[in-house]
Amino acid sequence: MASTQKRLHIPAAGGFGSLPFSSGVLVDKTFYLCGHIGLDPATKKVPESVDREIRLLMDSLRDTLAKVEMTMQDLVSVQIFCPDVSLFAQFNEIYRTYFSEPLPARAFIGSGPLLFGARFEIQGIAVKD
């Protein structure tokens, strides 16, 4: 039986116009999320505060999941890209407040510079039971 594919396109965050990707692609019960960064909606820039950036990032991920009637608990895999791995513990303090057990599989990956000067980029895969 062929899978049904529903492509969800949400305009690029921060008012940067139409970028050449979908914010998520839903295939059957699996939702593939693009990379999200934590831009301040008022300034369209990365906030000075690391904590605020993390919260904006996680809120963006949560809000995208809600568009297909999923929650953070539906995430099965998450990848976080970060040019400064010394922020690992600070990221974890806030990240953990968005989940209850069981937690998704996860990688925190040291990376090169991220777009718009972001400190973090997150992408994930969610599956609806």
Protein language model features and the residues they cover:
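N-terminal presequence-like segments and the immediate start of the first folded domain
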Residues: M1-D59, D63-V76, C82-D129
